[in-house]
Amino acid sequence: MNVLYNEYSAILTFFAISFSISTLILALSYFLNPQPSDQEKVSAYECGFNPFDDARATFDVRFYLVAILFLIFDLEISFLFPWSLVLGQLSIFGFWSMIVFLIILTLGFIYEWKKGALEWE
């Protein structure tokens, strides 16, 4: 048990310190809040006048789709970059595993394109 504790003591210490700091900051922000917000403070400010329209407009779902597609292909690049650096040292299995990964992502991209997920009308 002592050996196991020695291996994970740095990680446990890091989690304990980060949890303590997070709790301390949250408690300080709660107790040092100068005053509760009134209706005037939480209202939308528009050049000193009352707002003409509701400030909370709806958000188009296509923006979320574009963000998710960006994350997927950004993740692809994060896998592709280290692979390209060690390509000369990899075996044939490492090469073909990344080719299969790229084929799957390409097929997914073609599927999204055919379904019209990339169309902005």
Curated annotation (Swiss-Prot):
Gene designation: NAD3
Source superkingdom: Eukaryota
GO molecular function: NADH dehydrogenase (ubiquinone) activity
Residues of the signal peptide: none
Catalytic activity: a ubiquinone + NADH + 5 H(+)(in) = a ubiquinol + NAD(+) + 4 H(+)(out)
Protein species of origin: Porphyra purpurea
Subcellular location: Mitochondrion membrane
Function: Core subunit of the mitochondrial membrane respiratory chain NADH dehydrogenase (Complex I) that is believed to belong to the minimal assembly required for catalysis. Complex I functions in the transfer of electrons from NADH to the respiratory chain. The immediate electron acceptor for the enzyme is believed to be ubiquinone.
This enzyme's EC code(s): 7.1.1.2
Predominant cellular place of this UniProt entry's protein: mitochondrion
Family, per entry: Belongs to the complex I subunit 3 family.
Membrane-spanning residues: 11-31, 63-83, 90-110
Alphabetical UniProt keywords: Electron transport, Membrane, Mitochondrion, NAD, Respiratory chain, Translocase, Transmembrane, Transmembrane helix, Transport, Ubiquinone
InterPro entries referenced in this protein's UniProt entry, alphabetically: NAD(P)H_OxRDtase_bac/plastid (IPR023043), NADH_UbQ/plastoQ_OxRdtase_su3 (IPR000440), NDAH_ubi_oxred_su3_sf (IPR038430)
Lineage: Eukaryota, Rhodophyta, Bangiophyceae, Bangiales, Bangiaceae
UniProt keyword Ribonucleoprotein, yes or no: no
Pfam families from the UniProt entry: Oxidored_q4
Broad class of enzyme this protein falls into: translocase
Name of protein: NADH-ubiquinone oxidoreductase chain 3
GO cellular component: mitochondrial membrane; NADH dehydrogenase complex
Bilayer topology annotation: Multi-pass membrane protein
